């Protein structure tokens, strides 16, 4: 069966594993999921990610990050632009997540960027998700 929204599936698996205090999440690999994981690692929401060859295709393994007393570093995730309703933002009207404490992941012509990177480069695009 085909997956309608692989980005939402990725974010949901991350949220569920984080809520259950799992140390890692295994999910099907794709370039966009690896790019989102790279942004989450750079912003400090996950500790690391890697790709492994599976029997069929590749597997993306994301290592979740917790504080010293197991407090979650990933408080929340929300999918914004969906296959049925795409959400775009101009470079002058980029969203702020929790007044700048969170991160908006935006798909631009320059690749996947955070809201701050897109504002610095002066590009807009499709708002994929909010992470805080």
UniProtKB/Swiss-Prot annotation:
Keywords: Ribonucleoprotein, Ribosomal protein, RNA-binding, rRNA-binding. One of its GO terms (biological process) is translation. It comes from the Bacteria. GO terms for cellular component: ribonucleoprotein complex; ribosome. Pfam families: Ribosomal_S8. One of its GO terms (molecular function) is structural constituent of ribosome. PROSITE patterns: RIBOSOMAL_S8. InterPro entries: Ribosomal_uS8, Ribosomal_uS8_CS, Ribosomal_uS8_sf. HAMAP family: Ribosomal_uS8_B. NCBIfam families: PRK00136.1. One of the primary rRNA binding proteins, it binds directly to 16S rRNA central domain where it helps coordinate assembly of the platform of the 30S subunit. Part of the 30S ribosomal subunit. Contacts proteins S5 and S12. Belongs to the universal ribosomal protein uS8 family. This is Small ribosomal subunit protein uS8. The lineage of its organism: Bacteria, Bacillati, Actinomycetota, Actinomycetes, Mycobacteriales.
């Amino acid at each position: 069966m085909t997956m309608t929204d692989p980005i939402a599936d990725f974010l949901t698996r991350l949220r569920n594993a984080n809520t259950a205090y799992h140390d890692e999440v295994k999910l099907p690999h794709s370039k966009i999921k690896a790019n989102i994981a790279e942004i989450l690692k750079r912003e400090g929401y996950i500790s690391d990610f890697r790709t492994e060859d599976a029997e069929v295709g590749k597997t993306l393994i994301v290592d979740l990050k917790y504080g010293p007393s197991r407090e979650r570093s990933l408080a929340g995730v929300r999918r914004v632009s969906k296959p049925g309703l795409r959400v775009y933002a101009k470079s002058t009207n980029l969203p702020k997540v929790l007044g700048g404490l969170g991160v908006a992941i935006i798909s631009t012509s320059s690749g996947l960027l955070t809201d701050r990177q897109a504002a610095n480069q002066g590009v807009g695009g499709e708002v994929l998700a909010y992470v805080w």
